[in-house]
């Protein structure tokens, strides 16, 4: 029996590889004609069979599969199906899945997408690292240094939202915002790194100043006696590349638009910190909900 199960698993994995190869070659005229419209063999496979095969594939293969035909797309449309659960289990750490880090993401597909957009371990200061959960930045206790990180993926169009929160002391400067690929992620001293040049835009949570091009662009939010940031409080960042604006929310309160007239270039979620051993978590949420 165990041999039969092993053989069945190997056959399913082989079918998964074949499906992935089929998807990657579907851009060819012959393959496209065979697979499109659900009229070929691909379109006649039962959903439960497709779901089993798809559970062996990686994210990019699944995204390609969703473009093959209506039947395959429909099979992958359930964002909490076994396909997405299986990929979540393989891709995300147990810590991330068990903790409340991803509590505002209802689907397995949403959790996977958030991981794809998390802070980058390859695009950050040498004085920070991304923890095993895949979402939290830890700043090492290095004196006289300001250290930051960018998200893995930047945006040049559309509307996007993500959450950021501190899980340790802020220190004298703690900035959240956006940056181009050219913005530095480390500098000497304790400064507001995001907003220190024309390549980044930031909100310093310590003094509520908006920063860009090395200048203070006023206080935020624009109200009397604005409350100070509390450790653990989730701030939602809303980037609208269609209207070229950056806005923030705290809890269920819209704080307003912080920056307007953003350039038509690729902008990345970013954060900078100065306090030793502090930690910052970022979770990409996708398209913001209006209202």
Curated annotation (Swiss-Prot):
Chain ranges of the F-box domain: 39-87
Domain spans labelled B30.2/SPRY: 97-289
Name listed for the protein in its UniProt record: F-box/SPRY domain-containing protein 1
GO CC aspect terms: SCF ubiquitin ligase complex; synapse
Family membership noted in the UniProt record: Belongs to the FBXO45/Fsn family.
Gene this chain is encoded by: fbxo45
Oligomeric and partner information: Probable component of a E3 ubiquitin ligase complex.
Pathway this chain belongs to: Protein modification; protein ubiquitination
InterPro entries cross-referenced by the UniProt entry: B30.2/SPRY (IPR001870), B30.2/SPRY_sf (IPR043136), ConA-like_dom_sf (IPR013320), F-box-like_dom_sf (IPR036047), F-box_dom (IPR001810), FBXO45-Fsn/SPSB_families (IPR050672), SPRY_dom (IPR003877), SPRY_FBXO45 (IPR035784)
A Pfam family of this chain: SPRY
The organism's place on the tree of life at top rank: Eukaryota
GO biological process, one term: proteasome-mediated ubiquitin-dependent protein catabolic process
Taxonomic source organism: Danio rerio (Zebrafish)
UniProt keywords, alphabetically: Ubl conjugation pathway
